[in-house]
């Protein structure tokens, strides 16, 4: 649990299509070594990281993040599906990751501040590796996706 919690988010990458996989085998098994292209220097990267931390977050977005993460904890949740099916829920790092994630997403999309839509867009990749289902929930076919969707109903 603790090791997984250190990852900012879990991004699932699908298999490449046929042409993409063809490019992979050609590019990675030949003697030609591609030249990397620098897109920004270290200073610009640090400045971008600092910029994200200065993006203002409205109280409604901050409260939605807190509500969502805290409702995912079986010990304190008032959602029956969470109490019954979740063995451990997201900790404070999930709250931090969502806050930074929504700020970064708003910057990337050219907006001055994050919205509830940013929270909803990032909640699955940020929470799914920070929660675990009980054995009985898994046996019954309950999924983390369905539990997280239930959490999203609270703020949507």
Language-model region placement:
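C-terminal engagement/docking regions of AAA+ P-loop ATPases
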Residues: 74-156
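Conserved C-terminal "switch" segment of AAA+ ATPases
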Residues: 10-82, 108-112, 116, 137, ...
């Amino acid at each position: 649990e603790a090791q997984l919690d250190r990852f900012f988010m879990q991004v699932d990458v699908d298999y490449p299509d046929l042409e993409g996989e063809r490019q992979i085998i050609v590019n990675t098994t030949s003697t030609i070594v591609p030249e990397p292209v620098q897109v920004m220097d270290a200073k610009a990267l640090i400045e971008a990281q600092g910029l994200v931390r200065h993006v203002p977050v409205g109280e409604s977005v901050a409260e939605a993040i807190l509500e969502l993460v805290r409702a995912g904890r079986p010990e304190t949740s008032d959602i029956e599906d969470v109490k019954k099916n979740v063995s451990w829920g997201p900790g404070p790092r999930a709250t931090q990751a969502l806050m930074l994630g929504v700020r970064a997403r708003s910057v990337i999309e050219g907006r001055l501040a994050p919205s509830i839509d940013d929270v909803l867009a990032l909640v699955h990749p940020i929470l799914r590796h920070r929660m675990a289902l009980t054995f009985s929930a898994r046996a019954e076919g309950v999924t983390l996706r369905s539990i997280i969707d239930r959490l999203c109903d609270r703020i949507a």
